[in-house]
Swiss-Prot record:
It comes from the Bacteria. It comes from Nostoc sp. (strain PCC 7120 / SAG 25.82 / UTEX 2576). It catalyses: guanosine(37) in tRNA + S-adenosyl-L-methionine = N(1)-methylguanosine(37) in tRNA + S-adenosyl-L-homocysteine + H(+). S-adenosyl-L-methionine binds at residues 112, 131-136. The lineage of its organism: Bacteria, Bacillati, Cyanobacteriota, Cyanophyceae, Nostocales. This is tRNA (guanine-N(1)-)-methyltransferase. Keywords: Cytoplasm, Methyltransferase, S-adenosyl-L-methionine, Transferase, tRNA processing. Pfam families: tRNA_m1G_MT.
Amino acid sequence: MRFDIVTLFPDCFTSVLSSGLLGKALAKQIAQVNLVNPRDFTTDKHRKVDDEPYGGGVGMLMKPEPIFSAVESLPILERREVILMSPQGQTINQPLLRELVSNYEQLVVICGHYEGVDDRVLHLVTREVSLGDFILTGGEIPAMALINGVVRLLPGTVAKTESLTAESFEEGLLDYPQYTRPANFRGWKVPDVLLSGNHAAIAQWRYEQQIKRTSDRRPDLLEKWQQEKKQGSREQGAREAGGVGGEITTDD
């Protein structure tokens, strides 16, 4: 996977790209990150990348020319997505990360700054993506989150691939509580079931805790999960009925 990050502040990425699993993945060439500064594509002596908005308004906008020139300087791979990090975009979630991993080999990520970008930049963009319903000073932090989320799903980044499926959001529910040694810390004890060695009981406890935690913290996710589960049950029932009796008929 190739990432081309268009940013006025490439130095922001140095530590993130050299640390932890992300740094190891880049060292193993599982992914490649290329940082491009639109200021390098300005043509005036002041290297100006922003200007006042037409019609008035607060703050400055990033000019379109340096962004277009920066993006157009990049190679175009066959499966490419051009993403603008924007609070108006689709919120990053696990299904989005999996879609990007499955469908693309190159992600061009444009980081806005100031009060945003000239709207004509959207002619370059195939998708707008947001970190959430709040405003930051620029698109760099959301871009880092996007890169991290995508890279950890690439084969070879995480040693134990089963850990990618046994975590929050992968099954539509939040993760269950987890504990390590000591079994008793300041009077807070690890639940007995986790010490029992009974794998079936542990699995049941974890499932129940997932539902409880999701209900307490993200009832919206629980409702969505329940609806999807119901829909899946109906579809399975219809398939089974069709398999046993041939066509499914309804009485008016």
